[in-house]
Structures are given as structure tokens and as C-alpha cells.
């Protein structure tokens, strides 16, 4: 993955498609951080076990993380991301959030979501609170999210709305991060580096 692992930005947003290598890169950054004396790392997982496949995926990710980044604490927090960042961020602690896309999904379509419901309207306040926590975090942050706006325009109204909201969130986070990396085929492309 190269030279970008040699220095950790105070804040890094890692975007990419499914299986692009974004989570692996975040884990590599965490492992490099943990090699430093007195360093800690906390992984905030936002996935919820919606179905059997997701339960299996979460278990596989937990196992893989424990193997690749031993010593990193995992916190499962699908909704209260700002509070989790505030609680765990310290100068000696790297916080990895994986992923912003699932977190936004959780806000927009909570567990009690029904097919005829519209997108939840609680998300703007939650996103604003998260952005404040991101900017105020005393320790380094690595944020993982999906870039889903590169494909064809979706047919469904709610799917188009989600793509729009996620695109806006990604832009807001990218503005606040020192480094923004786009992952493709396991390779990092640096979009922004103000570190």
C-alpha cells in the first residue's frame, strides 16, 4: 500500500466501492499506529445484523480484525457515532469508524422501518453532531465509507435520495479531513493530503 502508511493524518477519509480494500487499508493504518509506544486503537463498527448474511459478515469481519490487528478494541455502535468518537478519542488513541455508509443507513432506515415509510428525518441533527465530534476529536481518526455515486442513476426515488444524502455526507466529511483516499482494486489513490 506504500508510503501513505508511513505517516498517519490526524483525520483520514477512506472511500471506495464494495471490496475495494478500504477496510483493509484502515486496518493497516491501525496496525502501524499500534506499533508506536503507548498507542491504542479503537474500532467503531456501525453494522447491524439485519439478516443471516449480515450476521455472518459481521462475525467474519470481527475474526479478521482480531487476527490482522490484535490489541484493537472493537465497539459496536450503529447509531450514536458522535458519542462513541467523543468517548474514545484521545491523543494516544486512533479511532477507526467502519463505516459511515452503514451508519447513515441506520439513521435513515431504523430497525422499525416499514416498506411504506419514508426516509427518517432525524438524520440532519445526528450528522451535524457527528461533524462537530469529528472536528473536535483530540486523537487521530480514520473514517471508512462507500463511494456509490459513480454508477448509473438509480430508478427508485428513495435509492436516489440515499445516494444524494451519502454523497453530501462524504463531501462534508472530506472537507474536514486532512487526507482523503479513494480505494480501487486494493490500491489507494490520494485525493487530498493536507497532513
Would you name each region that the model predicts?
Residues 1-9, 94, 125-129:
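SAM-dependent methyltransferases
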Residues 2, 8, 12-89:
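Conserved P-loop
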Residues 26, 61, 96, 146, ...:
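Residue-level signal for inorganic ion chemistry
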Residues 44, 74-76, 96-99, 143-144:
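Short, conserved beta-strand edge motifs with alternating hydrophobic and charged residues
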Residues 49-57, 97-99, 103, 135-140:
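Short low-complexity stretches enriched in small and charged residues
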Residues 71, 91-94, 137-142:
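Loop/turn-to-beta-strand initiation segments
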Residues 78, 87-108:
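A basic- and aromatic-enriched beta-loop-alpha substructure that forms the phosphate/nucleotide-
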Amino acid at each position: 500500500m506504500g508510503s501513505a502508511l508511513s505517516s498517519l493524518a490526524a483525520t483520514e477519509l477512506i472511500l471506495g466501492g464494495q471490496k475495494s480494500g478500504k477496510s483493509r487499508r484502515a486496518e493497516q493504518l491501525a496496525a502501524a499506529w499500534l506499533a508506536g509506544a503507548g498507542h491504542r486503537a479503537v474500532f467503531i463498527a456501525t453494522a447491524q445484523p439485519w439478516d443471516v448474511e449480515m450476521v455472518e459478515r459481521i462475525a467474519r469481519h470481527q475474526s479478521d480484525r482480531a487476527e490482522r490487528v490484535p490489541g484493537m478494541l472493537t465497539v459496536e455502535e450503529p447509531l450514536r457515532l458522535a458519542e462513541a468518537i467523543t468517548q474514545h478519542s484521545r491523543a494516544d488513541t486512533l479511532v477507526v469508524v467502519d463505516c459511515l455508509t452503514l451508519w447513515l443507513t441506520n439513521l435513515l432506515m431504523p430497525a422499525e422501518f416499514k416498506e411504506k415509510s419514508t426516509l427518517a428525518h432525524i438524520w440532519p441533527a445526528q450528522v451535524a453532531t457527528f461533524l462537530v465530534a469529528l472536528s473536535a476529536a483530540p486523537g487521530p481518526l480514520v473514517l471508512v465509507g462507500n463511494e456509490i455515486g459513480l454508477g448509473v442513476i438509480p430508478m427508485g426515488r428513495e435509492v436516489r435520495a440515499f445516494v444524494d444524502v451519502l454523497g453530501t455526507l462524504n463531501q462534508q466529511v472530506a472537507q474536514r479531513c486532512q487526507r482523503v483516499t479513494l480505494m480501487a482494486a486494493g490500491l489507494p489513490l490520494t485525493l487530498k493530503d493536507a497532513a
